[in-house]
Amino acid sequence: MSIIDQVKQTLIEEIEVSIRKANLAEDIPEIKIEIPKDPKNGDYSSNIAMVLTKIAKRNPREIAQAIVDHLDTSKAHVKQVDIAGPGFINFYLDNQYLTAIIPEAITKGDRFGYATQSKNTNILLEYVSANPTGDLHIGHARNASVGDSLANILIAAGYNVTREYYINDAGNQITNLARSIEARYFEALGDTSYEMPADGYNGKDIIEIGKDLAVKHPEIKDYTDEERLKTFRQLGVDYEMEKLKKDLSDFNVHFDNWFSETSLYENGAIENTLSKMKELGYTYEADGATWLRTSDFKDDKDRVLIKKDGNYTYFTPDTAYHYNKINRGNDILIDLMGADHHGYINRLKASLETFGVDSDRLEIQIMQMVRLMQNGEEVKMSKRTGNAITLREIMDEVGIDAARYFLTMRSPDSHFDFDLELAKEQSQDNPIYYAQYAHARICSILKQAKEQGIEVSTDADFSKINNDKAIDLLKKVAEFESTIESAAEHRAPHRLTNYIQDLAAAFHKFYNAEKVLTDDTEKTKAYVAMIEAVRITLHNALALVGVTAPESM
């Protein structure tokens, strides 16, 4: 529990004791402690007096006064309590207690802000899962950035997280990929009798694969059609996945598992899943197809599992896959999906309910669209290729750090305009530059301090820190752990980028108002230790969203 959370908890406990002493209520409602928007209203505030009005049957200001009269403030660093407006209780703290965060941050280093105890909860987080049929585009990039950041944050908050990529290597799109490669393969051998599929893949990469295979594997031309299709399917997927993994790795996005859809067919998981659902009485035959009674579990209609032609729908392997996830001992499943998958939420949740699995254990977060903007206009196509802009091109254009940060700093359920020009600016208007510059500026000051013989020390006299801007900065540092917890709980990495901006702003304000290296040696030592705590916090926060913290810029 962070220092700030400890203070809040102490205030809640003391208010509860005061309410009982004043005989205001036996069953006490939830007591909330908030940070006022206006610092003039204190460091913390509670509206409990208004909440108790109906229970105590008294004027809220009278209730507030009764609470204050019985309040023991000695344990919570309170120096003043006021009653404001209709009955708000405002607490003004002796903020010297905040300096305890400095040695804590310095001592914990790279682990500062992280939970010290495991939540003993296993989460399987699936993200990206793009079809291995071409390059990753800007939508995949947002999914990757948010997914990887969320995984980092959940781990920091004490969850056990498995990062998984589901390889869609068994559907019709892979057959089309194989037939496209086949046409380019024979074309490279001078045989143009093999036509591209109507919905085939016409990218330059497919032409290159065909040429490469024609040189390295001329024997494939003599295979039977079935053998050739199987070979091109596997080689095509392998080629695309190798390229995709390289792009994701360079984007600082990582996975623990690469789960193949084909494996669900090969190990009998799909057949076993269908048998289980039939055994439980949730399947039925109608119109020549096999259906699942998903409407029994809040889906708007039942869903087809096996079509009239005997082939599975896309829903069938997806159902088997999610049942497999549960059977691997995961407590919570989180899927990050594109906006076009919104209709999948209820049917997937319903499919788990058929197995007696609480559908609340499956969380599906829909990622909204990203528009790339340049000079106020949307950029839809690459000038180089004429195709959709790829993740690789985004990384090359603005850099990995800027791409990661920009794609994470908005709520994933909101549409986002990615300003390519802003992402490249070296100014305080650019959020990532502003944050990284704060870190680099601190490193520069620490270097100067060291040259003057002043080292970072946890034994400095922190009573020297009494400047308002310094206290505001320490408050932000003290909020780091609770921000991680909040971002994890709400599956919201953008809460952390918002925090990073606030922390950087607090540092820049302090820097502009106060000199760190002064003639007062003791004060300088205290400030040097303080900005090292800020540096550690910035470094750790940026790392959680996959961004570097440069020492110079």
Swiss-Prot record:
One of its GO terms (molecular function) is ATP binding. HAMAP family: Arg_tRNA_synth. The keyword Kinase does not apply. InterPro entries: aa-tRNA-synth_I_CS, Arg-tRNA-ligase, Arg-tRNA-synth_N, Arg-tRNA-synth_N_sf, ArgRS_core, DALR_anticod-bd, Rossmann-like_a/b/a_fold, tRNAsynth_Ia_anticodon-bd. This is Arginine--tRNA ligase. Monomer. A motif ('HIGH' region) lies at residues 130-140. PROSITE patterns: AA_TRNA_LIGASE_I. It catalyses: tRNA(Arg) + L-arginine + ATP = L-arginyl-tRNA(Arg) + AMP + diphosphate. Belongs to the class-I aminoacyl-tRNA synthetase family. PANTHER family: ARGININE--TRNA LIGASE, CYTOPLASMIC, ARGINYL-TRNA SYNTHETASE.
